[in-house]
Amino acid sequence: DYGFKEEYTVLFEIYDQDPIEVNDKDGSWKKKEVEPFYRAATDKHGKFSEDGISIPADISEVWLSSDYLGTASPVKLTINADHRISFNQNDYVKSLLEKASTPISRGATANQHKYLDVWTLLPGMDWDDNGRPNNLSKEKNIPPADVLYNIKSIFDKAGGRNIHDNYPEFFNGDMISDIPITKDTEVSLVFVNSSAAWYNTVGYYTYPTSEIPTIENIKRILAFPNASPIYKTAGVGALVCGDEVKLKYWNEDTGKFEDKFPKGVTIGWYLQGMGFRSTPSNGDSQGDLVKGMGPRYSTTILNEPGKDGVQRQRTISLRDSKSNQIVAIGFEDNIDLDYCDAIFYVHIAEKDAIDEGVIPELPT
């Protein structure tokens, strides 16, 4: 039972071994060339129940795997005495969150986490040692199934090809990943998934739509300390699909946060590569925010040139044309150009509040 409240059919596989191979040196992972002994699809609510599945008699545990967004994967399951297996994703996630909730004493925020001076925190924001923030919305914000399917499809790496290979038109130098606001509106950032080995930190900034931003005139506001799923293949994770942070607009004139982003501002996105300290190291404690591998901006002109002198596009933003209130955002943290190192979607509270002519449509 994957526990989806809305209609969402999931394809899954069951293996007699862990289908993921992890590189112990850098935490990267890849799928092994092994075949599952069972494949099936859930019903439209993410549930599956069937007798007669043939499980080899000599195995005592199996691995449940799915590449569908919103599913924990892979999950090791023990075969029951009656030779059955069961899985409830809500209970599984709850158990992981309970394991991650033990605090460690340090010094800076209320939970005593240190962070870089360049970060501004939302009012009352803090996080636990795994990077799960305390200001998440009470309810998960899961988009409609067709949006999840489309996001999965666009960022799929099947056949050794990725979004950069499949959609070169998004990388011709004209792509704008920042989001211009055309009507006062509330804005939320919702976690979808991450396939990154790194522990990345994600935030945002704003600037007047009519102006060109510079490093000196943007205020970087923290949204997610550790943009990693709680079931991260190797290491420390914090989030599940649907975890939402309601963003706030920083008004420079009043020096205060406001709930709504005003017409005439543009929202940019910011990823600090390896910005979250997953283990104590070099005087930093687990949960601290550090320089890591440096910043990546959605505003391409803010990115440092590579060795070839090129300022690379680090994000891609794609608009759901049906609602015009959802924008999928993929981040690229390093060099493989798959743009799924952190996948979020932006939820715009008001209809017709973003410039449709700037943000390309999410392919269907």
Task: Please give the residue ranges for each predicted region.
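Extracellular distal adhesion/interaction modules in secreted or cell-surface proteins
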Residues: 1-340, 349-364
